[in-house]
């Protein structure tokens, strides 16, 4: 059976809530306007790869600064030779994920898949390889964050 969410505006965010899950839609750089208490999970399918490098740094800093201790996450990125195609989507590999989130989260790479054949736009652009990565962002035992 489907759930019917209650929808409310919280500062610059539209928050939909049902079944104990709340989803806030808005600009991630405005997260300080939300009460993040009780947030337990982060899912990023396309935000990190949609942003140019300077904004990715700010994005990661914002998340690390506003998410409560104990938050876990899943982030999915793609990686290819960025010199062959201007983004977005931008290429974000494992080293960058570790650099951006490693001080806050224990990072485990869950997959590294060849997805070139599933992306005809990249094939048509002459991109020779395209990888999709999924990373678990776990609780860092000695993070000392509260």
What do these predicted ranges mean?
Residues 26, 43, 51:
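A conserved hydrophobic position in a structured secondary element of the catalytic/binding core
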Residues 34-42:
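A short acidic, Gly/Pro-enriched loop at the edge of an enzyme's catalytic core
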Residues 1-35, 60-146:
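Class I (Rossmann-like) S-adenosyl-L-methionine-dependent methyltransferase catalytic domain
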Residues 21, 38-39, 47:
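Local beta-strand N-terminus motif with an aromatic residue
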Residues 48-51, 87:
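Flexible, glycine/proline-enriched loop segments at strand-loop-helix junctions
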Residues 50-62:
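A short, conserved alpha-helix within the catalytic core of class I
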């Amino acid at each position: 059976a489907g759930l019917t969410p209650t929808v409310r505006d919280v500062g610059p965010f539209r928050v939909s809530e049902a079944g104990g899950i709340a989803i806030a839609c808005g600009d991630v750089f405005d997260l300080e306007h939300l009460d993040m208490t009780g947030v337990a999970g982060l899912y990023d399918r396309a935000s990190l790869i949609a942003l140019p490098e300077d904004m990715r740094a700010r994005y990661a800093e914002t998340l690390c600064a506003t998410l409560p201790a104990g938050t876990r996450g899943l982030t999915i990125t793609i990686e290819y030779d960025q010199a062959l195609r201007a983004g977005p989507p931008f290429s974000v590999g494992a080293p960058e994920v570790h650099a951006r989130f490693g001080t806050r989260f224990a990072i485990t790479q869950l997959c590294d898949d060849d997805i070139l054949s599933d992306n005809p736009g990249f094939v048509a652009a002459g991109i020779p390889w395209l990888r999709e990565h999924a990373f678990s962002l776990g609780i860092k035992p000695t993070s000392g964050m509260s």
